[in-house]
From Swiss-Prot:
Family to which the UniProt record says this protein belongs: Belongs to the dienelactone hydrolase family.
GO terms assigned for molecular function: carboxymethylenebutenolidase activity
Protein name as catalogued: Putative carboxymethylenebutenolidase
Organism: Salmonella typhi
Keyword Hydrolase set for record: yes
Catalytic residues of the enzyme: 147, 204, 236
SUPFAM superfamilies per record: alpha/beta-Hydrolases
Keyword match Hydrolase: yes
EC number from the UniProt entry: 3.1.1.45
Catalytic activity: 2-(5-oxo-2,5-dihydrofuran-2-ylidene)acetate + H2O = 4-oxohex-2-enedioate + H(+)
Keywords assigned: Hydrolase
First-tier enzyme category under EC: hydrolase
Amino acid sequence: MTTTHPSGFAPAASPLAPTMIHTPDGAISAGITSIPSQGDDMPAYYARPKASDGALPVVIVVQEIFGVHEHIRDICRRLALEGYLAIAPELYFREGDPNDFADIPTLLSGLVAKVPDSQVLADLDHVASWASRNGGDAHRLMITGFCWGGRITWLYAAHNPQLKAAVAWYGKLVGDTSLNSPKHPVDIATDLNAPVLGLYSGQDTSIPQESVETMRQALRAANAKAEIVVYPDAGHAFNADYRPGYHEASAKDGWQRMLEWFAQYGGKKG
């Protein structure tokens, strides 16, 4: 389970930038819940509008490598203000706590690499089920994810046939396989169940443009309903307003595109 760091952010995310955004929660209900999943109780953060008429459209928010820290919680609050029930499950909770790692390389090797994709996808199924029992509309299920969660977002779009729409922010597209990660997004382009919007950056040294073009070609070959937008002046994690690489113009445009994607493909109110 993710513990609370004094700043509200994982230590490996330091240094923090002064551009970080905090969304007030006066118009929303937000907090921590526990979701039964595969014999365990998975912690999750949720946010929803206080005033709602019937079941809410659902957005599962998938964490960055840093876990469900303050930025991901704020993403949930922003989505709640847009009328969604947003849930961010702590998908590392069985393997460890990201707050125990002081830097990104040890966080990746000591925790993130130990989390099996199959476990994550099954956990997300339980999140969707929890949402449908707690004020969410099972027929309007969406997902978005950032960095590590961006890759998972692509995979989940190929995993869950009930998903209506997905938006993946700067998630890895190609790479070496392992027992825990047997496939990458490029491998499942033919299997997408829902329209996927990918938001990427031209200056991302961890996701080169060659891999983005490889994914585009795979999507075209599969005739998949998907779109990839590249922001030429932005780097990796351009939406992470708490980090020095935050690129405000790209982040704002990406956020608006995400909302429009959800509105277009997210399903009709029952």
